Amino acid sequence: MKKLYILLCGATVALLMAACQGGKTAAADAEAGDTLEMKYAKLLTIVKHGDGEETSDAAEGIDYQYAEALVANPWKAGTMLHRYILIPKGEEGDKTVAMLAKRRSTGARCTTDTVRTPVERSAVFIAPHCQLMYELGCQQAIRGVCDLDYINIPDVKKRVALSGNTSAGISIVDCGSSMAPDIERIIALKPEAILLSPFENSGGYGKLDKLHVPIIEAADYMESSPLGRAEWMKFYGMLFGNEEGKSNGISGSCESKADSLFAKIEKEYLKLKAEAGKLPKGLSILTERKTGNVWYVPGGQSTIGILLKDANARYIFEDDQHSGSLAMSPEQILAKGKQVDVWAFKYFGGAPLSQAQL
């Protein structure tokens, strides 16, 4: 049997990470405006609306009266998961809210939430998105987190430790498990938005749905490419700021930072992909670990599956056509992966695992 290498991945995932009509047809379901070009993302459509006049330049800048973000349903083609209306705060934004209230159709076929931007207080249930907010310089908007043990960001840990100290500045509340969040703590932190990962057939979000707080369904992990997932940062940049300012000594808005950061990631990713393509086929790889009686692995067309393909690795499920996770039995995994070169999985414990423990 080949020597098996065990890779223990940290909690921070790499940043490689439509209307009631799915995909790019979502723009047709939105009100007339300028559609932001999305080169890779297939599940997200953003339409910007200018102040009375629609111009082709509006989609490229950060000046707009309001914007629509349309999230396609990854699990039901041709339908929309959620629609967001992003309206800047302030008097002009108040007028826009009133204007839209008068003309908006009451027959919406999907959940629609109005979000006043920039969002200054949020509960973030997803560790990679916490890291992204630090990269964009809008970490001050993180006021609550879930699954704290999985967040490997020292400043988040420090701010959670300050929770309850009214003189401590911008602290963070530990809201418990993302699967069963502490509703009372979430209410107390007064979030303007809750950022979480949606799941197929979830049946809603229980008590969270009753808080009347916009729930941002971050379906980026269901994109069909790593760059498609990364491109969602343009949406998050719009959520957390379209005003010029300074954070961590870096000037500029979260929105403009998202554009420049994505351009940098795209350039580096394509460069590395091209270099990997020139090399001989890499090692075979198996991912993840057994959860209960099920072993969930990324589908061949998932962001992780495509990432491994672009890295020239031999992923054992690369021929699979699913963009989500595959639920396999341990027996199926052993039958297909017992001769793999590399076993890679996420692990959040304090000490390394041994083969005996696994």
Residue ranges with predicted function:
Residues 1-28:
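Bacterial Sec-dependent N-terminal signal peptides
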